[in-house]
Amino acid sequence: MGDTAKPYFVKRTKDRGTMDDDDFRRGHPQQDYLIIDDHAKGHGSKMEKGLQKKKITPGNYGNTPRKGPCAVSSNPYAFKNPIYSQPAWMNDSHKDQSKRWLSDEHTGNSDNWREFKPGPRIPVINRQRKDSFQENEDGYRWQDTRGCRTVRRLFHKDLTSLETTSEMEAGSPENKKQRSRPRKPRKTRNEENEQDGDLEGPVIDESVLSTKELLGLQQAEERLKRDCIDRLKRRPRNYPTAKYTCRLCDVLIESIAFAHKHIKEKRHKKNIKEKQEEELLTTLPPPTPSQINAVGIAIDKVVQEFGLHNENLEQRLEIKRIMENVFQHKLPDCSLRLYGSSCSRLGFKNSDVNIDIQFPAIMSQPDVLLLVQECLKNSDSFIDVDADFHARVPVVVCREKQSGLLCKVSAGNENACLTTKHLTALGKLEPKLVPLVIAFRYWAKLCSIDRPEEGGLPPYVFALMAIFFLQQRKEPLLPVYLGSWIEGFSLSKLGNFNLQDIEKDVVIWEHTDSAAGDTGITKEEAPRETPIKRGQVSLILDVKHQPSVPVGQLWVELLRFYALEFNLADLVISIRVKELVSRELKDWPKKRIAIEDPYSVKRNVARTLNSQPVFEYILHCLRTTYKYFALPHKITKSSLLKPLNAITCISEHSKEVINHHPDVQTKDDKLKNSVLAQGPGATSSAANTCKVQPLTLKETAESFGSPPKEEMGNEHISVHPENSDCIQADVNSDDYKGDKVYHPETGRKNEKEKVGRKGKHLLTVDQKRGEHVVCGSTRNNESESTLDLEGFQNPTAKECEGLATLDNKADLDGESTEGTEELEDSLNHFTHSVQGQTSEMIPSDEEEEDDEEEEEEEEPRLTINQREDEDGMANEDELDNTYTGSGDEDALSEEDDELGEAAKYEDVKECGKHVERALLVELNKISLKEENVCEEKNSPVDQSDFFYEFSKLIFTKGKSPTVVCSLCKREGHLKKDCPEDFKRIQLEPLPPLTPKFLNILDQVCIQCYKDFSPTIIEDQAREHIRQNLESFIRQDFPGTKLSLFGSSKNGFGFKQSDLDVCMTINGLETAEGLDCVRTIEELARVLRKHSGLRNILPITTAKVPIVKFFHLRSGLEVDISLYNTLALHNTRLLSAYSAIDPRVKYLCYTMKVFTKMCDIGDASRGSLSSYAYTLMVLYFLQQRNPPVIPVLQEIYKGEKKPEIFVDGWNIYFFDQIDELPTYWSECGKNTESVGQLWLGLLRFYTEEFDFKEHVISIRRKSLLTTFKKQWTSKYIVIEDPFDLNHNLGAGLSRKMTNFIMKAFINGRRVFGIPVKGFPKDYPSKMEYFFDPDVLTEGELAPNDRCCRICGKIGHFMKDCPMRRKVRRRRDQEDALNQRYPENKEKRSKEDKEIHNKYTEREVSTKEDKPIQCTPQKAKPMRAAADLGREKILRPPVEKWKRQDDKDLREKRCFICGREGHIKKECPQFKGSSGSLSSKYMTQGKASAKRTQQES
């Protein structure tokens, strides 16, 4: 990159992290710089030109015969772990290699836990993540053009101040020393900025410049200002060489030369284009009364044709009456009510009929809807009856036979009925609302953005958006319902106020004094809160204060409001308050559109819009539609009489230019003929020549104050200028696609450029010197180029002020550096990106932002499908491509060499465009201002000839929204066709099992039990520990009783598994009235006195508060919980099941081994607990035919089931196992071997069991549906046998569910396909069957719910205590070192070392060479060298070690007692290398390793 990378600094604002040296050394050779977040430090690299960056998988997974050596997954999440321990069964070579690998990672010494082995590192892109030190979610991040990390940068008009202390992006060595410093907390940064201030002295010392140099500097800076580049007012202390800043791109620049290079970059051009597009639309004038009237006529037409009328409402009421009669017999106590558009009239004639059933409290919603489904199926009036019980609002769907209308029946949908009641009342009281909403909804329907199942918006939100607009107008038409007139009201307390109902045209609100004060808290969530205040407010404004505004004007204003004025990215659409509600107040992520339902304020009703391309498409449609309705569109008779005169607006020289090139001449002939086909919309005046008045754009703007007028869609604008010399050319630019415009002064042709799409128009005018100076042209030279109206790219008058001051003698060839820079500077005042139809597949600029606060879903990188036409001619009948990408139609190629010669002369080509755009500005302003003159000189035009229509082509420009799956968030398919739905995986049939293979399966299952089950001595030792602890605690807590539960007592425990202890106090049956948190803290204080315990850690924030500690003598980790009595009975139940049949234990141990090897058995990391898998085994054995075990909770001696309540739950089960054959008739009937049962279990959960429809419940034999439990939103549903409200699978994400099911499917194949002999690479059958590279395909379990620092669930990165402590230490040291600048270089290296400890993965192998593992083949070593730079890490200084040891107390080993690692990483925990069980205890997988890496 050379000097290209030097001129920039990156501003460090409150929303952006800092960077280190590697951030600048990596990435695309043609890209000057890149801003990424801190979490990616060390993950990138500098590459050779043309070398494609690829993901590399560090880690040695051993030899997998089925996939070849070093085979791992292609899953990007599989790169998390710094180490991977081999499966339990391995040969000596595996063990030796594993020892070598672990030697550098697990030293078990607190003094050197941060010392990494020097050697090459392989940078790995694990997943798209936010900055580890970035809390604000709207931080700007930029895209690596090779796909390293892509995020979307939102364009904001409010730019940061020039004085903001900033960070160098590249530049002098002094600055490079400081770039590696990680980002500090906002508070500390602000304090540091105050301490540092700015350097004294001017940014540029003008006193040493000569008069000529000073003049040149001033002229150059004037040109830079046009591109939003300004001189800094003061020199930042951190980056003293910075002289300029780009307000658009938020970077610091060292010199004018580097500023010109920045101006030419795609990033800057894109921001300029966005700014100009917005300013163009912003300057459009209000519509004239005639326009408003024409718009109103178009809206009335839509309402009459599609809106609901009285007869339609009567029809829907009749359907409700018919349905009431159908339900009368089986649901006598229920009543029906219409809601939705059938009641509010804010819909269409063919809208669904929404009916809600009100039912008594003794019935449940599932019971009601199941009866509804049954009744409708038996009715003759309704057909096509179906149910969607897995929707957020479960409904029964049917179709009324006579009318054919679709009916959706819900039960207890109270919030929707309240919202409907509100909308209905507003529609009756404010007559303009109904047509406005119907027009808005019809617009959304035409644009295909009202389909939530396809990633669009729910239709009713457009009514809320219209109401919100009417409330936010400068002269509001509707009132808000909460505000400062209410005593004690403030936005921060908005969560305490709720709308309750509508009564007699007033809104009833209620205030509850909630301590939370969170907007998301609703009345239902705080039932114990007592309303302390009620009030009411009118639904509409007083008639005296209500302005009279036509619907047409409201429509144009609404489009402008959402297209330009309202900040959709940061604010919430809430009709409750006048003040703007921020997303932070609602604690909603900053993603796309946020809309609050006034009666269901907790959830964002626009959350179905889950794709950035769809959001960009909606903005595109809003802006396009606003532009269409804001500009005048007329039908004139002259368009029919003199269509060919439109071609006469060409100067003599322009004709020469066209005639000079035969292609242009040919297309000009076509152009003349094409106007005939344009229809009545194409207009022209009678004049044959066109001369532009010699007005500068500034003068024009001052004279007329009107905006440029542009064409869109197929509508054609009729311009009536001041005199007959100025006419409009209405032509179809399809005929000009691909034209080459010849420039005589350079003797060159511009590259082929596809500029037009259907509906765009060409305007050619005489560009004479003295009227408008052509950019870069010489005297007496006029050129003609095409005008692109599609992208809203015309600059405003303000942007065009400097046009007449351009240097005419700039060197077009670029041979003079200074001249070229000046020319490029001038041109870039108007320059945009090359038009979207470039002949290259271009990576998108923007991609979806990551979000920590909600479940993070990976979205695929988007590209714009560009088309290449070799002839330069696009298909005239073809519309735009389907809208598939970032919304950037004018994307530049990422690499300079891809543009070829075109890039060299791009500015010359763009120049002509912008001059013509400037001329169009004048013409339009003249035409809009001087219509009366036009009427005198041209044929009279009746103002009633303004014409508008609702057309999909006009609103969308031929684009269509991207279909996005709501399940996987990927494009191109719907949820019902999602390939990630594991039920859609086609399973291959399994061959019959041979007796020999069955015998092997039996041996494998029994071996698992033998290797992992604890001995009698160990069980006795656990009991001894309990007794010892009990007696010790009783000294301070008299009457204390300790009881073992969990794996220690249920019969399914592993060797060295944790010791779970429940503490109760005699005389207290429950913890009611006991301060559990204080008791746990006191218990921890007492335990610290015990000499045999270490690392006592109270955890009071957990759902069940516990004390964790390490028992020195046994080496066990112990958890003591308080009054976890239900768990004691769960333990008894499992113990009873394990005693019924030995096969139960064998299968449960096999299942636990299987899940540990696949890393799917750790609930703290987002998967299922071993308890949940045990319940899955028991459920399978109960459902087997014949069953292996009974349902103990359904066996009892009397006629009625006994009831024994603990914590409100019946904990009865049949525990007399000796008497079981008497009460269970099928005892002993199942004689299958344990191997058959194990394979049967895998097949049961992959082939038979429907996870979507049924619940895994061991308390009943009959099937239990997820709808009955109302757990339809979960993926795997496992019911606790006693606590029936506890779903053990509630914490699973979709990714983890798919990962678990994939492991089961692969296990079915491995255990279900007989093999005659095991491959030689497998030393034992155990390693063959439990090879994680096969079972999980080499992938690691996803961690989308885990903290990215410590690896645990329950909090996100910004709340991680480990992160806070590290930041606090760094801030203290940074503040200290501010006074000692000579230590900055050393400190920055040490900072980077600490950061890499938590964010970077280390690969250490013998001979210091990285081992690379890829799914297909190993990458060559040279690629690794190219992708990664060796980082020789120095050991940190002693003072940091002591500080780290103090800060990282939460990460401590419960075996050796040392800090800095956890139990599973401790070498003392590994045991001997030859021990099978000890190998298993390492789990060999992600949980231990990822924690170290991410911590």
Curated annotation (Swiss-Prot):
Instruction: Enumerate the Pfam families for this protein.
Output: MTPAP-like_central, PAP_assoc, TUTase, TUTF7_u4, zf-CCHC
Q: Where are the zinc fingers (Matrin-type)?
A: 244-274
> Sorted alphabetically, which keywords does the UniProt record give?
Cytoplasm, Magnesium, Manganese, Metal-binding, Nucleotidyltransferase, Phosphoprotein, Repeat, Transferase, Zinc, Zinc-finger
**Which EC number(s) are documented for this chain?**
2.7.7.52
Under InterPro entries, the record lists: Matrin/U1-like-C_Znf_C2H2 (IPR003604), MTPAP-like_central (IPR054708), NT_sf (IPR043519), PAP_assoc (IPR002058), TUT4/7_NTP_transf (IPR045100), Znf_CCHC (IPR001878), Znf_CCHC_sf (IPR036875)
Residues at which UTP binds: 1047-1050, 1057-1060, 1130, 1152, 1170-1174, 1286
Sites of the modification Phosphothreonine?
Answer: T57, T64
The PAP-associated domain covers which part of the protein?
A: 551-600, 1233-1286
Q: Where is the composition biased (Basic residues)?
A: 178-187
Query: In this entry, which stretches build a coiled coil?
Result: none
Q: What is known of its domains?
A: Utilizes two multidomain functional modules during the switch from monouridylation to oligouridylation. The catalytic module (containing the 3 CCHC-type Zinc finger domains) is essential for both activities while the Lin28-interacting module (LIM) at the N-terminal part is indispensable for oligouridylation.
Task: Quote the protein name from its UniProt record.
Answer: Terminal uridylyltransferase 7
Record the organism.
Answer: Homo sapiens
Protein's gene? TUT7
